């Protein structure tokens, strides 16, 4: 399974790159708004340090606006993927952009039928939001299972990006289900590398080593 990092923060991206954990980057308007600088400058810098796909989201909600923005975004770098919201106009935009060879990531997916429609429209990626589904006391990972089964049944090329990842268990379950990608916030990525027994083991080894030095 590939790891994308869900951030627009350059320092977080560089830190994850140093761990060898960045197969791609996803951003959204909320993440971009947290960073200093112009939108296109931030995206351009991310694309310059990351070899894999970099998702940048349109702001417009109408078909014409989304297509225009998407074409402009695609000119920034070859590894740009345009994020399009899961709406009727969004699906129309995805169809047009796919025919033009522009890669797309349909975002804000909350049902298997939405994911099916995204795939039929030709989306490169589909992003179901598991954490937000869990917030409603529903099972976000069950949605990933449904989408994975549908895509397998009909051999869609669309890849599943598990989004709205809140904890390491989301990542583990995504891998067990067979999702293509999980897009992970930096803090969750760091948590994946941690375990209480690892910490205890290190403390024990260091304590034993100090005893040897003091002999």
UniProtKB/Swiss-Prot annotation:
Keyword tags: Cytoplasm, Pentose shunt, Schiff base, Transferase
Residues annotated as the enzyme's active site: 83 (schiff-base intermediate with substrate)
EC number: 2.2.1.2
GO molecular function: aldehyde-lyase activity; transaldolase activity
UniProt superkingdom: Bacteria
Enzyme class: transferase
BP-aspect Gene Ontology terms: carbohydrate metabolic process; pentose-phosphate shunt
Pathway stated in the Swiss-Prot or TrEMBL entry: Carbohydrate degradation; pentose phosphate pathway; D-glyceraldehyde 3-phosphate and beta-D-fructose 6-phosphate from D-ribose 5-phosphate and D-xylulose 5-phosphate (non-oxidative stage): step 2/3
Main location class: cytoplasm
Catalysis performed (reactions): D-sedoheptulose 7-phosphate + D-glyceraldehyde 3-phosphate = D-erythrose 4-phosphate + beta-D-fructose 6-phosphate
Compartment list: Cytoplasm
Gene Ontology annotations for the cellular component aspect, listed alphabetically: cytoplasm
Task performed by this protein: Transaldolase is important for the balance of metabolites in the pentose-phosphate pathway.
Family: Belongs to the transaldolase family. Type 3B subfamily.
NCBIfam families hit by this protein: fsa_talC_mipB
Xref: HAMAP family: Transaldolase_3b
Full protein name: Probable transaldolase
């Amino acid at each position: 399974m590939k790891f994308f990092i869900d951030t627009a923060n350059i320092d977080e991206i560089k830190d994850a790159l140093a761990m060898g954990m960045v197969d791609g980057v996803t951003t959204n308007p909320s993440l971009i708004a947290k960073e200093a600088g112009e939108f296109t400058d931030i995206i351009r810098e991310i694309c310059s340090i990351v070899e894999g796909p970099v998702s940048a989201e349109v702001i417009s909600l109408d078909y014409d606006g989304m297509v225009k923005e998407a074409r402009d975004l695609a000119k920034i770098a070859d590894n740009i993927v345009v994020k399009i919201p899961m709406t009727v106009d969004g699906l129309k935009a995805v169809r047009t952009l796919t025919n033009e060879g522009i890669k797309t990531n349909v975002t804000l997916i909350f049902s298997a039928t939405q994911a099916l429609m995204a795939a039929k429209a030709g989306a490169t990626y589909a992003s179901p939001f598991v954490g937000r589904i869990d917030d409603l006391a529903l099972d976000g990972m069950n949605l990933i299972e449904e989408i994975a089964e549908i895509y397998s049944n009909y051999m869609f090329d669309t890849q599943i990006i598990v989004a709205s990842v809140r904890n390491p268990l989301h990542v583990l379950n995504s891998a067990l289900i067979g999702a293509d990608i999980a897009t992970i916030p930096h803090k969750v990525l760091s948590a994946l590398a941690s375990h209480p027994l690892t910490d205890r083991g290190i403390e024990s080894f260091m304590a034993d080593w100090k005893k040897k030095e003091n002999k």
